From Swiss-Prot, chains A, B, C, D, E, F:
The record marks H16 as: Transition state stabilizer. Reversibly transfers an adenylyl group from ATP to 4'-phosphopantetheine, yielding dephospho-CoA (dPCoA) and pyrophosphate. GO terms for cellular component: cytoplasm. Its EC number is 2.7.7.3. ATP binds at S8, F9, H16, G87, L88, R89, E97, F122, S123, F124, L125, S126, S127, S128. Substrate binds at S8, K40, T72, R86. Keywords: ATP-binding, Coenzyme A biosynthesis, Cytoplasm, Magnesium, Nucleotide-binding, Nucleotidyltransferase, Transferase. It catalyses: (R)-4'-phosphopantetheine + ATP + H(+) = 3'-dephospho-CoA + diphosphate. This is Phosphopantetheine adenylyltransferase. One of its GO terms (biological process) is coenzyme A biosynthetic process. It holds the Pfam family CTP_transf_like. NCBIfam families: coaD_prev_kdtB, cyt_tran_rel. GO terms for molecular function: ATP binding; pantetheine-phosphate adenylyltransferase activity.
């Protein structure tokens, strides 16, 4: 099966990476879809984020990396995905995730959002926490892939 | 009884409309008070929002539509309302709603905030979700009244 | 308006009493409906609970105290109530309350459950906490009306 | 793919049934595994529950109904399932579900628990709510399949 | 400082043990107070639980193990403790913990309940989950100290 | 013991002040560390906030007031603090607080974040609620120390 894993990945964390690995081993194929949102000003450009994800996933079979604009359900259809994959952290905005899953189902009944529980020791991790720690010069190697750590530290030097 | 239903209604959703109908049949009168908040830049002007609400509620007996600035409890007093009405969605910011209700009671003991549970199938709906879907060209007729859908689609064309 | 306030009140707490007073001043009449639930073995008999509530509310205009078996919405109809009243504590089982409110609306569209936020300093209070403290000989006068405190202390002597 | 959908189903609700249909169309095969839990005294015997589920799912392709004792991950392995399927209601015990999903992963890394968001209008529904309403003679046809409604009403007559 | 760490510890988990170690290094002394609750029928007797805790903490400086009946705040006073220590798991009953902390403060203003966040990878762990897995013959060595694992497995053989 | 109490305190509320008093009586010393966050535009300048806090705490023994930039755990180390102190309101972002506590522990194992439950009647209070009420000319004397109330009212005149 082919799963679409949408997100801003600004930047990719080890929690995202864990979910990608588990998604690939469970469904076989995961399309990592980086959302290009004109209303937001991301820390990393779309190109950098795609390069970071490609670098971090180059050893994982069944991964495709791309970007998209517009509705997730429409992009899932264009990519012939079977489902939309999302992670649920104990400390995540559970209500927001259910709200988006319900909204997507009203837009296209065929697209289920499938949730996997994020690993317990990644449950405190989010891109915003990583950026806050990096901005203050803190250690982030246990939070993000190597290349992301290097590029973040350069950005906040 | 007269209920004051305050909010930004940017824009009005079918969830709001359902609550207005139920408020009117329960209490007899509902004053829909559109908050004019100088610190925010709404998607629709105050005039458009008032026109949208008037259009959507023209068949409902006991509805008044107006705008206000300043404290909700003070406006409730000016409008001779008996209570403040708010909706609670399973997927709403329950803690924020209770925080505002407590704050309002410390400002004026006479004004109770009365909560009604939003209909289950509207529990995923919020103005921000509607705008996000509309911005990406998604179908919103099942989320907002007709006039709001048309005006939103024009805005994001 | 007439509100039906259903519960087991095993025993009545100062949080319940606060809600009864606010319900009466807001709606005019509150029917306190003590649920007789054959599947549960309450600490106080139905008669004791009704006597405790009558004693605690004797100074409050617009209060009626009675018991009922079966569905809340059906009893509300029999008592000609206009709505069902429930309290929401920050530390209450919000999801359970919404679940019951939705269930009741599917059983009888005419019966809305109206929630009031429990006073902040009562938000930690529940009948089970009161009984736990009383069982261990703790001070409970700041949690329950006087008669309830006396009868609880006798029970756990 | 083959999903294992474990639960007590005491009794099966329309929320469960909706999840079974969506699981089958998404994964192709769903094994409905009724947990036989010696420490609990269910309302319906294991046989009745299995018969009810078989009756309600007879038109759905890819469904298998059976019972099991012991650990879910071990039974999933015995049935050659690819994953464990669970529903997440906005008003469900999200934290308990994540707790069980994490526990199962520590017991067998190969078994992911995949969550689907329960349909919004079923989000208030649970077996315990159904039994409570039925016990008080309330209408339950909008909550459970026909056969379950009939057998529940006979039980509580 | 001396912290009182009350609980039923039925049985002690690695999450409890982690909190005990962190409490000792932070405050110097931790009194592990096993609650003897006549209204409950524990899996392990009071003596077994005390023996298990003593065995698991024998290498930790500053630990005392005892049992108590009645109010936590009163026992804290009898033991000359400075504060009450509790763990908060992301997946714990946060509202129940706050409810008990508030209740204890109304009973004795001098006793603060101090919370530490349970380690992320223990956040799914609780005594009831451990017993459920053990009852079904599952692996529990990653959840409880060795002696507890052995005694649990004997109990459920 | 010395506790570091970090925050933006923009402005100090009576809820903060209550926690400072309780922290001092529990640990002996509390360093109130006002975070200087270049990415945010606070309502009050750093100097005004420090002056407000010094004024409000001048009668409390064991208080030190200062500001810091960068990582909380690093500043805690520089100030020789023994722990980080935070308040938990029933209506606070519990998940965000746990996320920060876990993050800080991964950055420096030696720094525990210790939580105290905010007093029940302050549980609805936050700096943002205070500013919203003050902006609309509402009464705030029951929410903030006197000097803060005066300065806020001047700011929003």
């Amino acid at each position: 099966m082919k799963a679409l894993y949408p997100g801003s990945f600004d930047p990719l964390t080890l929690g995202h990476l864990d979910l990608i690995k588990r998604g690939c081993s469970l469904f076989g194929e995961v399309v990592i879809a980086v959302l290009e949102n004109p209303t937001k000003s991301p820390t990393f450009s779309l190109e950098s984020r795609i390069a970071q994800i490609k670098d971090a996933t180059k050893e994982i079979r069944g991964v495709e990396v791309c970007s998209f604009k517009g509705l997730t359900v429409e992009f899932a259809k264009r990519k012939n995905a079977d489902l939309i994959l999302r992670g649920l952290r104990a400390m995540s905005d559970f209500e927001y995730e259910l709200q988006i899953a319900h909204t997507n189902r009203t837009l296209n009944q065929n697209y289920e959002t499938v949730f996997l529980a994020t690993e317990a020791h990644f449950s405190f991790l989010s891109s915003s926490v990583v950026k806050e720690v990096a901005a203050f010069g803190g250690e982030i190697n246990h939070m993000v892939p190597e290349r992301v750590a290097t590029e973040l530290q350069q950005k906040f030097k």
